[in-house]
């Protein structure tokens, strides 16, 4: 007895849906690197297609089936050199499996291990960041498919608040004046000590479109995020390392807005070869230490617009 295709029947309420699919799907993936060892990732996938108003449901099992087929094909036949390429492969396969779809989207994100050394004692440690990719495909009336892809990373760092630091500096100056110190001595003292402030654990995120024929290195994105906060964080720190990290962050205080703007500037400088219409997303979230809320800053723009603003 053949089962009827319930998904293909008409729905009771004839309204189209923008995205239908599966989320939180994990698969082991191997990414090739030229002249370097392969990277093995365990990414989490989100895959979606749109659904016309005339159809009750998508064929849900086809979406995880697509990921399984693409991942297996990578292992056996095809070499993939980037997570964004993997996303594009899945999008194209989604259109094959879901012939009624006019839009398909894939998001993947994965932990990414980085080998680091502590800043003073040079102790080896493994640091964890996140890498991510997105591909979005559209099929026109003639059946032609166009796909845009993005790649990015998320990195944790430390930020020090400039406002609180300035308040404490003013308090210190007033107390030193009360104790009879000269302006010259006060200046020497302040130049010799680190002024306290409250800190945040900063989370920087950058996503950059990868136009056809271009490459965007994830390692470069990670470096930009790290260098855009007050300082880096490390899994392993000895005493001298800890003192160095804390002092460095307090000598480089930054608001959440400063971090976002620094990332934007560095993205424009590092990826100066990308076309004007390349999409860029920059986001900074600072987990506050003296508030219950978090601080947030974001910019979504085209590369050309950013270049014009920065006059680069």
From Swiss-Prot:
Pathway: Cofactor biosynthesis; 5,6,7,8-tetrahydromethanopterin biosynthesis
Homology family: Belongs to the GTP cyclohydrolase IV family.
Disulfide bonds: none
Residue intervals passing through the bilayer: none
Organism name: Methanococcus vannielii (strain ATCC 35089 / DSM 1224 / JCM 13029 / OCM 148 / SB)
Record-level Gene Ontology MF annotations: GTP cyclohydrolase I activity; GTP cyclohydrolase IV activity; iron ion binding
Protein name: GTP cyclohydrolase MptA
Cofactor(s) of this protein: Fe(2+)
Enzyme class: hydrolase
Family matches, as InterPro entries: GTP_cyclohydrolase_FolE2/MptA, GTP_cyclohydrolase_MptA
GO biological process: tetrahydromethanopterin biosynthetic process
Functional description taken from the UniProt entry: Converts GTP to 7,8-dihydro-D-neopterin 2',3'-cyclic phosphate, the first intermediate in the biosynthesis of coenzyme methanopterin.
Details of cofactor binding: Binds 1 Fe(2+) ion per subunit.
Site residues (May be catalytically important), renumbered to this chain: 161
Catalytic activity: GTP + H2O = 7,8-dihydroneopterin 2',3'-cyclic phosphate + formate + diphosphate + H(+)
Assembly with partners or alone: Homodimer.
Pfam families: GCHY-1
Keyword annotations from UniProtKB, A to Z: Hydrolase, Iron, Metal-binding
């Amino acid at each position: 007895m053949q089962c009827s295709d319930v998904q293909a029947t008409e729905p009771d309420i004839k309204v189209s849906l923008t995205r239908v699919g599966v989320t939180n799907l994990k698969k082991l993936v191997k990414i090739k690197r030229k002249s370097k060892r392969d990277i093995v990732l365990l990414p989490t996938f989100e895959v979606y297609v749109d659904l016309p108003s005339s159809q009750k449901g998508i064929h849900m099992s086809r979406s995880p089936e697509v990921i399984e087929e693409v991942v297996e094909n990578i292992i056996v036949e095809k070499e993939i050199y980037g997570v964004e390429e993997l996303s594009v492969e899945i999008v194209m396969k989604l259109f094959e499996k879901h012939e009624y779809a006019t839009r398909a989207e894939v998001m993947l994100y994965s932990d990414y291990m980085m080998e680091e050394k502590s800043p003073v004692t040079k102790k080896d440690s493994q640091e964890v960041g996140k890498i991510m990719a997105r591909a979005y495909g559209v099929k026109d009336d003639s059946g032609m498919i166009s796909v845009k892809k993005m790649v990015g990373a998320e990195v944790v760092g430390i930020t020090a608040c400039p406002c609180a630091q300035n308040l404490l500096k003013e308090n210190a100056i007033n107390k030193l004046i009360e104790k009879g110190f000269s302006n010259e001595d006060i200046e020497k003292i302040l130049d010799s000590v680190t002024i306290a402030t409250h800190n945040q654990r900063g989370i920087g995120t950058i996503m950059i479109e990868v136009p056809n024929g271009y490459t965007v290195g994830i390692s470069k994105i990670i470096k930009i995020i790290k260098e855009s906060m007050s300082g880096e964080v490390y899994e392993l720190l000895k005493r001298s390392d800890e003192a160095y990290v804390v002092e460095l962050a307090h000598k480089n205080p930054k608001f959440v807005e400063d971090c976002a703007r620094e990332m934007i500037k560095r993205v424009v400088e590092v990826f100066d070869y990308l076309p004007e219409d390349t999409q860029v997303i920059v986001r900074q979230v600072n987990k506050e230490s003296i508030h219950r809320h978090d601080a947030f800053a974001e910019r979504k723009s085209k590369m050309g617009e950013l270049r014009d603003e920065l006059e680069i």
